[in-house]
């Protein structure tokens, strides 16, 4: 287990490279400190996630789990330390970030066309919709989706991206038991193909052999 106030050693996977790029790791934090609103959320945090690996960010509500995900995504700048890694990353946050007026398929295709994997965006979207069990509502406007369907649509966006590193912020929120099992299967398939995941959650998710990053 990695704790924010104690830099981790190499037992948690490939250590971040000396130049801070985390060469060989999908994601690497080296001595990262994050401050928001004058409050230190985590300090001198170091860990690395190798290809095929997983890290589970845990801790009480408000401790900084979502901020850590945002730092990993490049959306929040740490006050010190370095964030690196070889993998292209994609983010699943609380909001699906899909055009509510468009049919689900077209809303996902908009993002798929911009993603790291340029080939066959329509095909990638179709496969992702099938994977999350939403193929039957592909032509339904996003605004008409239920909360659980919107969460699965957000996951479909991640699946269709082709990114090597999935950054998942509370991915089980709004999902029933069957959908959480589906999420776990998709993560397992992604990891088996060499992909990596960083998951922040307060709900139980099965992540075999995942390292734990404890905040708070």
Regions found by a protein language model. Give the residues of each.
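Hydrophobic anchor residue at the start of the ABC signature
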Residues: 155, 194
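ABC ATPase C-loop
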Residues: 158-159
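A short, flexible loop at the N-terminus of ABC-type nucleotide-binding domains that lies
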Residues: 2-51, 56, 77-80
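Conserved ABC ATPase "signature" region
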Residues: 120-137
């Amino acid at each position: 287990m990695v704790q924010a106030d104690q830099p981790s050693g190499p037992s948690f996977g490939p250590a971040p490279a000396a130049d801070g790029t985390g060469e060989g790791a999908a994601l690497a934090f080296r001595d990262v400190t994050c401050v928001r609103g004058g409050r230190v959320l985590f300090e001198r945090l170091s860990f690395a996630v190798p290809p095929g690996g997983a890290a589970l960010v845990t801790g009480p509500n408000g401790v900084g789990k979502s901020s850590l995900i945002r730092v990993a995504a490049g959306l929040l700048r740490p006050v010190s330390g370095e964030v690196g890694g070889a993998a292209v990353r994609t983010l699943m946050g609380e909001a699906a970030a899909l055009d509510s007026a468009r049919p689900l398929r077209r809303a996902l295709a908009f993002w798929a066309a911009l993603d790291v994997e340029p080939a066959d965006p329509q095909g990638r979207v179709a496969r992702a919709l099938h994977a999350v069990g939403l193929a039957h509502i592909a032509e339904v406007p996003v605004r008409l989706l239920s909360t659980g369907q919107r969460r699965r649509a957000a996951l479909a966006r991640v699946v269709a991206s082709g990114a090597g590193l999935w950054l998942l912020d509370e991915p089980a929120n709004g999902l029933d038991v069957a959908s959480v099992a589906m999420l776990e299967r998709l993560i397992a398939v992604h990891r088996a193909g060499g992909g990596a995941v960083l998951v922040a959650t307060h709900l139980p998710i099965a992540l075999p052999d995942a390292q734990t990053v404890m905040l708070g």
